[in-house]
Amino acid sequence: MPRFVEVFGRLAKVAEDEGVRIAFENCDMGGTWNRPKWNIAHSPRAWEMMFNAVPSQVLGLEWEPCHQLVSFVDPIAQLRKWVGRIYHVHGKDASVAWDVVREQGIRSGINFVWHRTPGFGDTNWIDVITILRQGGFRGSIDIEGWHDPVYRDELEMTGQVYALNYLKRCRGGAFVANPLS
């Protein structure tokens, strides 16, 4: 953590002075928290270490449920705990083939998890949006769909539009201004 403190302690100070925030994506990028290939910020244990080492509120997370599901972490419980540190959200989901996991385990070489476009995965996005709103999040959910094994290439835009409409329904539909405000 000394190198993290050295680098991100300085960057946090600059961000504070400029009025901006720094968000780490919760993706392992092929590594683990203690042997990262690219990204230290993929697990709650790492987040605790990072935010304790540099306690600035300008440091937070770019969060998406996909990376939690593929690690068998409950994204809803995690979001409830960390919502105050969520500064950006990716709309990316995952599907877990629990029948394959139960029969073959996770080291059989048989694929058991897929990154999915919102609306085609296992995440309850109504809960995600509710928790984000209750936690004061006012940002966007940026749909990340090219990973989807079905809605990619020539079907990517179809998946993106479906996800946009799905997420709008999950938030309660089209925005309607309160006439009493």
Regions picked out by a protein language model, each given a short descriptive name:
Residues 1-60, 70, 178:
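Active-site acidic/histidine proton-transfer and metal-coordination neighborhood
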Residues 2-13, 17, 45-49, 77, ...:
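Alpha-helical scaffolding segments of alpha/beta enzyme cores, especially the outer helices
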Residues 26-30, 65-67, 95, 147:
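Active-site-proximal loop/turn and secondary-structure-junction residues that shape catalytic pockets
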Residues 33-48, 67-138, 152-158:
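Gly/Pro-rich active-site loop or hairpin
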Residues 153-176:
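C-terminal helical cap(s) of enzyme catalytic domains, especially alpha/beta-barrels
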Residues 144-147, 151:
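Aromatic/acidic polysaccharide-binding cleft in carbohydrate-active enzymes
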Residues 22-24, 59-63, 87-91, 139-144:
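Hydrophobic faces of well-ordered beta-strands that scaffold small-molecule active sites
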